[in-house]
């Protein structure tokens, strides 16, 4: 049975914003390794559209960006959306019955399946489907934006904390 994991970069004041700050080299390598080992990813529409950047090679990319793109392209993706009519390669659209589709996905697969995007994660949290939360805490303060938890924070228990690179702490929580 697969485990659903929600992990995102977060500011010290609890916000996520991929445009305001991003991973440094060590954290990016960590994300490459994670992507290479994942059984797949579940995206909301907005995050999926952001990630489509990795569909096409870009001449300015270095070897690590090519490695991440390859890992992203190779893994199966499920895109939760009522407005999209089609999705790209290696992706399947989930339009109805979110709970049933994700329960089926977890039952059919093994390994880790990433959940991407705070709004989708909130819906899956409310359904009791997320098995682990990974907060990649960065030393920045945004003051506004989209919070990591898009709704009430669920009761959580700290499982682990570790440093990645010079300035990022990964906090790993499971539902309490």
PLM features: residue spans?
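Enzymes that bind and transform nitrogen-containing heteroaromatic metabolites
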Residues: 1-176
């Amino acid at each position: 049975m697969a485990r659903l994991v929600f992990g995102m970069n977060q500011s010290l004041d609890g916000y996520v914003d991929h445009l305001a700050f991003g991973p440094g080299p060590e954290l990016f390598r960590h994300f490459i390794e994670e992507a290479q080992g994942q059984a797949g990813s579940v995206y909301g529409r907005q995050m999926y559209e952001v990630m489509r950047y990795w569909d096409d090679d870009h001449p300015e990319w270095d070897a690590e960006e090519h490695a991440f793109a390859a890992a992203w392209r190779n893994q199966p993706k499920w895109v939760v959306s009522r407005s999209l009519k089609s999705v790209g390669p290696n992706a399947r659209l989930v339009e109805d019955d979110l709970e049933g589709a994700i329960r089926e996905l977890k039952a059919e697969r093994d390994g880790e399946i990433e959940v991407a995007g705070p709004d989708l994660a909130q819906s899956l949290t409310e359904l009791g489907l997320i098995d682990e939360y990974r907060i990649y805490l960065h030393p920045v303060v945004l003051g506004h934006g989209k919070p990591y938890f898009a709704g009430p924070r669920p009761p959580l228990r700290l499982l682990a904390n570790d440093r990645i690179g010079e300035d990022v702490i990964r906090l790993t929580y499971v539902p309490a």
